[in-house]
Amino acid sequence: MDLLSGTYIFAVLLACVVFHSGAQEKNYTIREEMPENVLIGDLLKDLNLSLIPNKSLTTAMQFKLVYKTGDVPLIRIEEDTGEIFTTGARIDREKLCAGIPRDEHCFYEVEVAILPDEIFRLVKIRFLIEDINDNAPLFPATVINISIPENSAINSKYTLPAAVDPDVGTNGVQNYELIKSQNIFGLDVIETPEGDKMPQLIVQKELDREEKDTYVMKVKVEDGGFPQRSSTAILQVSVTDTNDNHPVFKETEIEVSIPENAPVGTSVTQLHATDADIGENAKIHFSFSNLVSNIARRLFHLNATTGLITIKEPLDREETPNHKLLVLASDGGLMPARAMVLVNVTDVNDNVPSIDIRYIVNPVNDTVVLSENIPLNTKIALITVTDKDADHNGRVTCFTDHEIPFRLRPVFSNQFLLETAAYLDYESTKEYAIKLLAADAGKPPLNQSAMLFIKVKDENDNAPVFTQSFVTVSIPENNSPGIQLTKVSATDADSGPNAEINYLLGPDAPPEFSLDRRTGMLTVVKKLDREKEDKYLFTILAKDNGVPPLTSNVTVFVSIIDQNDNSPVFTHNEYNFYVPENLPRHGTVGLITVTDPDYGDNSAVTLSILDENDDFTIDSQTGVIRPNISFDREKQESYTFYVKAEDGGRVSRSSSAKVTINVVDVNDNKPVFIVPPSNYSYELVLPSTNPGTVVFQVMAVDNDTGMNAEVRYSIVGGNTRDLFAIDQETGNITLMEKCDVTDLGLHRVLVKANDLGQPDSLFSVVIVNLFVNESVTNATLINELVRKSTEAPVTPNTEIADVSSPTSDYVKILVAAVAGTITVVVVIFITAVVRCRQAPHLKAAQKNKQNSEWATPNPENRQMIMMKKRKKKKKHSPKNLLLNFVTIEETKADDVDSDGNRVTLDLPIDLEEQTMGKYNWVTTPTTFKPDSPDLARHYKSASPQPAFQIQPETPLNSKHHIIQELPLDNTFVACDSISKCSSSSSDPYSVSDCGYPVTTFEVPVSVHTRPPMKEVVRSCTPMKESTTMEIWIHPQPQRKSEGKVAGKSQRRVTFHLPEGSQESSSDGGLGDHDAGSLTSTSHGLPLGYPQEEYFDRATPSNRTEGDGNSDPESTFIPGLKKAAEITVQPTVEEASDNCTQECLIYGHSDACWMPASLDHSSSSQAQASALCHSPPLSQASTQHHSPPVTQTIALCHSPPVTQTIALCHSPPPIQVSALHHSPPLVQATALHHSPPSAQASALCYSPPLAQAAAISHSSPLPQVIALHRSQAQSSVSLQQGWVQGADGLCSVDQGVQGSATSQFYTVSERLHPSDDSIKVIPLTTFTPRQQARPSRGDSPVMEEHPL
């Protein structure tokens, strides 16, 4: 094992030594003309690569021959073994080394890349090509003529033209032989300094011209190769007369240098020769020897007379760096003089470097395809740069032009490897066009560039891409068919078959053209005539062979030029544009395109509108049509006119086109109700109508068209009990349930009709008045309902808003956020102000409590209360609220279950304001039995006295006794000051809120009347203790207006007096309003209902959400701190001026406190549901404590900012909704104000301003009442705004978080709910955890707080 490990390490080290340089050279010798598949060498062995184990490589070792694209290599190499073989290509030394001097070796070089990258090396292999005798020596001519004078001496030598053999060495010319010389001439061979063998003819005998003047013989030349090769030429010798002297050159060897850029005609050298003869024999003739090459003869000119050598053609040092010119000077004799002129052509930097790219990675269509996951340093190509110039002009550097993930690494002189320098990413770059730059060191330097394209391989998800996005071609008319116009080309980022591109003509291509599918050459196949067509615009498609194939196209524009003999041509004979009717003036309607087949000014077209149509304008150059009018499709649906096009020729030509502009409908019309025509249409619905019956049909029309005119109907308000439903398409209003007694009355259903327009739907609303009754004979009732329907607007179920753009939503959200922030700041400010202003008044209230004449408390109780107060002050606990519960229940004389009246006194113990805040005072119902007088309308207990023990021996007629004998016409019902004890009209089952979930003790008092009747007693609250006492009540006559007979019923009275409370809240707004207290209006529901909140419906019973009855859609939320409806009561001194002694003893009632009949026309006598207290008014219905502040009721007015929700009027008051007590009245149901301010919990008006539905402020701006309820763990905020509308003051609910249904009230309905003469409210009380019986359409079941 150790031996193997050592061998492996040695092999690796050896490989590192072998390949440390990154490049190697290896020489082999071969002979020319070698046959194919001859083994030359083995690189694996010769380079010792067999020592490297294959297991150490990621891939097997590979030998790759690197050669220039297009070259035919003379050898091949086995990629797996590294063996080198010859190919079928001929190895011709004379051809490969034609420009090399004969005395130099001939080499053939190739590069071999050894892969993989771990052992990559580039090996340069040099093959020395040995010459073989494959060429015979040849004379320059087949006949050689020479002249010899007759007096030539024996052994005289005359030079003959030498033969030439391309072979070298022994394979070259070795011997000359003279055949058939007749022993007169002989042949000698001499060797020149250059190594050439020159034949010389020797005269062996005397010559006699008169005897023989011509000799003909043969000359043979032989080489020394094997087999030996030879050739012959005819030698013809002429004998001439005697010429004693021969010419002599002044210089026999001349060497000159001349730059290769010397112009033609430049003198190279001047030869000088002399002859001793005279006359004709002294004339010297200069000529080139036959040994001068043809190239030299082509480049240089020799003046035969003067001997001047000049440049005949431009020289090129890179082709032939030097030239040997053998010049002969002859005087006509047989012995010419010889002079050798060596012309050296000096180098000039006139050649740019050349870049030779030899790919290691085989390219595809001259593009190297690389996978994006190839490793770093992957070898791509071998770059060889050369320069034919010499010295510094031939020194070349190579580099790339910009930052790319590839680099050039030098390996040999002027050779570089292109390899990856960073990881490739197909998603970032799909292909690279690498520009290689080569520059020499000349002055100025010359450079050359070459492009190398690399594609990153990926999946076939790319369509072919044309190199040009738009091809423009011009061709003259009357062309010959078959002319090639242009060649289009496209590339595809994919690879393989997916990158193979076929070129096709598009479907719009005319038949005059054809396209080569493979090359993309576009050809004209027909003769073109510009008069028929001046230009062609079509597409050429490039489609790959993928599945499915992907295509791309390029637009080709072929233009033909001719004279102005064509009129402008519209692209269409008629134009139809469609524009929305809300297109602004000068907006863009459309574009008219005109073409003119002519050229230049003749094709300059000017557009105009005919018939002086001023409604539209057209740009004379661009053809853009713009309107000068505003469109209205409902007025005109289309416009038609003609556009004229005129060219700019001398004799202008014109044409016209019809333009029709169609106005497209935009949803700019709201649906308009046809049925009912107004908000004052009434429909009678009989109570016996079966469910599912269509009771009414609404109909609305929309002036728009299409979906903008499609109308859908929905009920959005007034249908609180879900008694009706509407078909959204037909508008049919259907009765959903059987009507019962509680459903009788006028139902004001708010119906919305909205269209289906996009993007914004428009809508309209209408009030459908459905009168559920047996008949319409009761004119008084109908008139009253109609009157109230005009005063009590309808509450929408949800906010109806015309949805606009998302931007408007953002604006609304921003406005709401700002308004909320301002509201919070205002509330905090008001709270601080109220607390500051209450401090002195609370002290005064405590002082006044000591002088209270309302009830004399038991000393024990007083002492106990004071101790509790001290204890609570130490604990910093919230102060208790004083809650007074007064409940009177009356039974009819004919009630078989009645066994007499029993008076029950419930005293709540330790009721804290937190407990009170958690109780749902609004939604907990209390029910009176039928036909009992409405007592809650005028009596409320607001006593500030502490809890006390009831003394049974107290005289019955005592003013301060808890049981009062009341006349039957006195409608007396009182509850705690926080809960709602409202009166209702003729509805026998209307509901009132009277309940409190606290622990109390009950003192039942049985009341006996004549005759005794059985009654059922239900306690409002659980009692700890019970004591029964019997009290007789003498019924009093009722008012005439009520039409009742005295003595037929008794009433049950129950007082609830909380123990130890120092605070109370007044009436929750119960009691009917005087009909005359509202300013009557003749108009209906204002259309601005989204800004106002209304009542859901008005019924004969006037049971609304604002009169204190149980709200069928409100949901009790445990922990919700409910604010009290606050009523400020006047002092007894103020009331005693209008009341009888009986009122002062038994309490105020309709008989004594209010007039017998109501004057509806006397608006100046309008009164509120509460009276203003005169000082001392020491306590408010909500007392500000240290945190947590449990309740805040504030009405934002001009200072002082301490008003609450009720209205204050000067006497004579018409209705009282609370119990009035004898002075000192030290506790009120409103926030305390310093005297003589009459703005306690109500806004005070001095007559004759008597509109109860309106609140007077220091400014006409609407004020905001913010009702804030907070809890330790949850925050519920109700913000109620009051605005002065046409129908009265209306509240706007800003949202109640955590409430199932928003509550909507108006001041008029809140404070003056009804004026009906019959007021019967059945009353019921609840024990803890008892649930109220929900009415139809209730919210989830209301529960009392577990406390």
UniProtKB/Swiss-Prot annotation:
The alphabetical list of record keywords is: Calcium, Cell adhesion, Cell membrane, Glycoprotein, Membrane, Repeat, Signal, Transmembrane, Transmembrane helix
Task: Provide Extracellular-side residue ranges.
Answer: 24-812
Where in the cell does this protein reside?
Cell membrane
Q: Which residues are glycosylated?
A: N27, N48, N54, N344, N553, N773
Give the UniProt record's GO annotations in the biological process aspect.
homophilic cell adhesion via plasma membrane adhesion molecules
Looking up Pfam families in the UniProt record yields: Cadherin, Cadherin_2, Protocadherin
Signal peptide residues are: 1-23
Spell out the InterPro entries in the cross-references: Cadherin-like_dom (IPR002126), Cadherin-like_sf (IPR015919), Cadherin_CS (IPR020894), Cadherin_N (IPR013164), Protocadherin (IPR013585), Protocadherin/Cadherin-CA (IPR050174)
Per the record, the major location class is membrane
What is any one of the record's Gene Ontology cellular component terms?
plasma membrane
Residue ranges in the Cytoplasmic topological domain are 834-1347
GO MF, one term, reads: calcium ion binding
Q: How does it sit in the membrane?
A: Single-pass type I membrane protein
Q: Where are the transmembrane segments?
A: 813-833
Superkingdom of origin: Eukaryota
Does the UniProt entry include the keyword Glycoprotein? yes
- Ranges where the record places region Disordered: 1057-1091, 1097-1116, 1325-1347
Which intervals hold domain Cadherin? 26-139, 140-249, 250-355, 362-466, 467-570, 571-673, 677-795
User: What function does the entry list?
Assistant: Potential calcium-dependent cell-adhesion protein.
Record's protein name: Protocadherin-11 X-linked
Organism per entry: Pan paniscus (Pygmy chimpanzee)
